[in-house]
Design a protein with these regions (language model features):
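A polyanion-binding, active-site-adjacent surface
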Residues: 1-148, 153-194
Length: 195
């Protein structure tokens, strides 16, 4: 099984679309394990994550772990949590933050990796890019609406907002997220982690 994971990783590194990164010695940033039970899908990694080769090692990551109710060790070392961004590379900065993930990247690589993770019980969709792509929703559907209606997408998918500090105002304006959504998320994650 490890051979298949390594083959996919090598294919990602060698594909022409990623040549600009490979030439700079930049490796794709994701984590996929045959024993994974939870899959976290978010946007592309940020610049700091790419430089450190460590995802979610910032305030957003701490908040995400709090929301999930998992420890640092469970998040990074249990091998029960896969992390698959919509793009495995930091693509640069735009006018309003990091550039979005490439449109076809996840379509090409995610299915190959997911096929090797047969024990996934819950896919957590973090933010708009992941939610719209995986739930096949038009861009006109707002992330707030998606998260409010999260139960529609269970038991396979659980959409949430991005845990960025920039979303603090959103969290204050939408108290139902803390009172209704997060307890359910934590309950489901804990149940799966204890299997």
């Amino acid at each position: 099984m490890a051979d298949y994971f390594n083959q996919i990783r090598q294919a990602i590194i060698e594909t022409p679309e990623n040549e600009v990164f490979t030439k700079q010695g930049i490796k794709p940033l994701y984590a996929a394990y045959p024993e994974a039970r939870i899959n976290i899908i978010a946007q592309a990694p940020g610049q700091k994550a790419q430089e450190q080769q460590m995802f979610w090692n910032d305030r957003s990551g701490q908040r995400l772990r709090d929301w999930l109710g998992v420890s640092w060790d469970e998040f990074y070392h249990s091998r029960k949590i896969a992390i698959m961004p919509m793009d495995f590379y930091f693509l640069g900065k735009g006018r309003s933050g990091d550039l979005p993930p490439r449109a076809d990247f996840a379509k090409k690589w995610h299915p190959q990796l997911i096929k090797l993770m047969p024990h996934i019980q819950l896919t957590i969709l973090v933010g708009s890019y992941a939610s719209h792509a995986y739930l096949h929703l038009p861009r006109s559907v707002k992330q707030t609406t998606i998260v409010q209606n999260y139960q529609k997408y269970l038991p396979d998918y659980f959409p949430i907002i991005h845990p960025s500090p920039r979303n603090q105002i959103w969290i204050k304006k939408n108290p139902w997220f803390r009172t209704n959504v997060l307890p359910d998320l934590q309950h489901r994650v804990r149940k799966i982690m204890e299997l």
